[in-house]
């Protein structure tokens, strides 16, 4: 599901809100989440999951085009850990 599909689905389910209001709310929520992670804070949405930053240590990588070794710096990357309710709902799906 893309962001625009999410906005469309929410606007359909929340008929009292216009599509523009839903779009604004979704964009603001995502912006706040990004800002919170950017400041190094953790985000927890009970039943859904938590977002945090994990440190990825410096390592030697490989340029896939040329095959040469490249030194990659350490960095923080976003990490999502699903909550219990979300895990149970996904586990219940028979694919």
Curated annotation (Swiss-Prot):
Keyword Amino-acid biosynthesis: no
Signal peptide as annotated in the record: none
Keyword vocabulary terms for this entry: DNA recombination, DNA-binding, Transcription, Transcription regulation, Translation regulation
One GO cellular component term noted in the UniProt record for this chain: cytosol
Residues spanning the membrane: none
Pfam families given in the database record: Bac_DNA_binding
Gene Ontology biological process: DNA recombination; regulation of DNA-templated transcription; regulation of translation
GO MF terms, alphabetically ordered: DNA binding; structural constituent of chromatin
CDD domains (alphabetical): IHF_B (cd13836)
Entry annotated with the keyword Nucleotide-binding: no
Protein origin, superkingdom: Bacteria
Family named by the database record: Belongs to the bacterial histone-like protein family.
PANTHER family hit by this protein: DNA-BINDING PROTEIN HU, INTEGRATION HOST FACTOR SUBUNIT BETA
NCBIfam families linked: hip, PRK00199.1
Function: This protein is one of the two subunits of integration host factor, a specific DNA-binding protein that functions in genetic recombination as well as in transcriptional and translational control.
Subunit structure: Heterodimer of an alpha and a beta chain.
Protein name stated in the entry: Integration host factor subunit beta
Species of provenance: Shewanella amazonensis (strain ATCC BAA-1098 / SB2B)
């Amino acid at each position: 599901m893309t962001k625009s599909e999410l906005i469309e689905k929410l606007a359909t389910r929340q008929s009292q809100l216009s599509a523009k209001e839903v779009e604004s709310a979704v964009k603001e929520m995502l912006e706040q989440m990004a800002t919170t992670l950017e400041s190094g804070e953790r985000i927890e949405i009970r039943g859904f999951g938590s977002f945090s930053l994990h440190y990825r240590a410096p390592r030697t990588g490989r340029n896939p085009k040329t095959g040469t070794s490249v030194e990659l710096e350490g960095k923080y990357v976003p990490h999502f850990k699903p909550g219990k309710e979300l895990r149970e709902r996904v586990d219940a799906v028979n694919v």
